[in-house]
Design a protein with these regions (language model features):
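Positively charged n-region of N-terminal signal peptides that target proteins for export
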Residues: 1-4
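Bacterial N-terminal signal peptides
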Residues: 7-15
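N-terminal helix-cap/turn-to-beta initiation motif at the start of protein domains
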Residues: 20-31
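Central antiparallel beta-sheet cores of small beta-barrel/beta-sandwich binding domains
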Residues: 29, 35-103, 107-109
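Structural recognition of beta-strand segments within beta-rich domains
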Residues: 33-34, 129
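Structural motif
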Residues: 46, 115-116
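Short polar/acidic secondary-structure junctions
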Residues: 102, 113, 126-128
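Edge beta-strand at a domain terminus
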Residues: 119, 125-138
Length: 138
């Protein structure tokens, strides 16, 4: 009886911990304005990964002209997924994803950090995160 009660309590604690981690991980979900106010990106969750789609661009009708895939160059930037495959890593940090830069058509490894004020620090990099640059999304 004691063993059953102990296992039940242990299972309950594990479920509560997992629920708390999911709530923390989902804090990134929302709409953000990119640095300089050029575009808006909405981040959502699909399965266990977080992705971001461009939903507004300051220049209406802008096409993905720098995309290395020829067939994508005539498609509009609005509606394009530019953040892909992020997973919650630790407190206020999501990594393991990629960011597409429509200004040069390149895709980079990326890490996202949620600041206390709700802004995101988005760091795109090649190889290791030391070799990259930050941008702040509000």
């Amino acid at each position: 009886m004691k063993k059953t009660l102990f296992m039940l309590c242990l299972s309950f604690i594990a479920v509560l911990g997992a629920m708390g981690q999911t709530a923390d991980a989902d804090r990134i979900i929302g709409t953000y304005m990119t640095e300089g106010g050029k575009a808006k990106v909405v981040i959502d969750k699909k399965g266990d990964t977080y992705n971001g789609k461009l939903i507004w661009n300051m220049t209406e009708g802008l096409l993905d002209k720098n995309n290395p895939v020829k067939s994508e160059q005539t498609k509009p930037l609005v509606g394009k997924t530019i953040l892909r495959g992020f997973k919650y890593a630790k407190k206020d940090t999501w990594d393991g994803g990629k960011i597409y830069d429509p200004e040069n058509g390149k895709t980079y490894s990326c890490k996202i950090t949620l600041k206390n004020n709700g802004d995101l620090t988005v760091r795109g990099f090649i190889g290791v995160s030391l070799l990259g640059r930050n941008t702040t999304w509000k």
